[in-house]
């Protein structure tokens, strides 16, 4: 009897996940003026910006969602074609990644470290910006702009973090590297790499994993005339620690090659109007 209850509960959860309406999966952000940036920041100075209303996903795009895209289109990612994905393993020096020809979204850290079979609710990684563009085209959505992402992340705050001025509470809201550096493996929060989306507490607007878990691609340029091969990502990832890659905040902006695939890189979608369910 207990087993039957568990199975019934699982079916209900799966149905709710699949049938969730766009209104449940997205947060509406009203048009208006917003304060973004940080005083003295070279690439993102404090300023007031206007944005039109938009919608942004509550969660980062998952392996399950990306798998549906691949199943429908037979799409082959950059990492699968080029065999040049970059993955991380504990014990390497700071900012040192290794190329793994076996790594792609189904095996985000390489075949030797296992696949995503039991991680369908984790964010998809080891994909390029180009791959994400193709997904968005299929799904009828888009990436948030740099400004939209920050407005959604801040959730009305003007401090460095949506929960205050200091990062003391980061472990409540984000899957980040809690060790002092990367020479020692750290999974004290239960996750060495990615965690299920929505596992940590949301920001005040109900958006999950705005900090940590995976870097999130954004559209737009930091400066005029920027090379088209360079794109941007925000929010930090599971790899970011207090000592290095301290990007789990509301103001920093990362930069990466458009065709590069990293095991800590993912995305969250947005839309100008409420999208149809795919």
Predicted regions and their residues:
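Acidic/histidine-rich helix-loop elements
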Residues: 35-44
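Terminal peptide-recognition signature
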Residues: 56, 62, 66, 132, ...
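Functional-site microenvironments in short loops/helix caps that host divalent-cation chemistry
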Residues: 27-29, 33-35, 76, 82-254, ...
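Bacterial Sec-dependent N-terminal signal peptides
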Residues: 1-24
């Amino acid at each position: 009897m207990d087993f039957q209850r568990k199975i019934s509960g699982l079916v209900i959860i799966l149905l709710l996940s699949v049938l969730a309406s766009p209104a449940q999966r997205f947060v509406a952000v009203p048009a208006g003026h917003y304060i973004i940036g940080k005083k003295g920041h070279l690439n993102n100075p404090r300023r007031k910006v206007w944005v039109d209303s938009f919608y942004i996903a509550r969660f980062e795009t998952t392996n399950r969602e990306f798998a549906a895209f691949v199943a429908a289109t037979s799409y082959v990612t950059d990492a699968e074609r080029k065999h040049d994905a970059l993955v991380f393993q504990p014990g390497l020096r700071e900012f040192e990644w290794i190329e793994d020809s076996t790594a792609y979204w189904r095996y985000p850290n390489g075949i030797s470290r296992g696949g995503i079979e039991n991680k369908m609710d984790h964010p998809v990684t080891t994909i390029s910006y180009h791959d994400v563009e193709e997904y968005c085209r299929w799904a009828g959505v888009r990436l948030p702009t740099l400004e939209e992402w920050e407005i959604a992340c801040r959730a009305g705050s003007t401090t460095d973090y949506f929960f205050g001025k200091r990062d003391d509470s980061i472990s409540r809201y984000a899957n980040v590297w809690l060790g002092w550096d990367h020479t020692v493996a750290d999974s004290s929060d239960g996750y060495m790499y990615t965690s299920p989306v929505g596992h940590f507490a949301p920001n005040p607007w109900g958006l999950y994993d705005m900090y940590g878990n995976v870097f999130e691609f954004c559209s737009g340029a930091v400066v005029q005339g920027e090379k088209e091969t360079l794109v941007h990502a925000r929010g930090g990832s599971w790899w970011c620690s207090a000592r290095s890659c301290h990007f789990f905040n509301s103001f920093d902006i990362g930069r990466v090659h458009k065709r590069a695939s990293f095991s800590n890189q993912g995305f969250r979608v947005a839309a100008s109007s409420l999208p149809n369910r795919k």
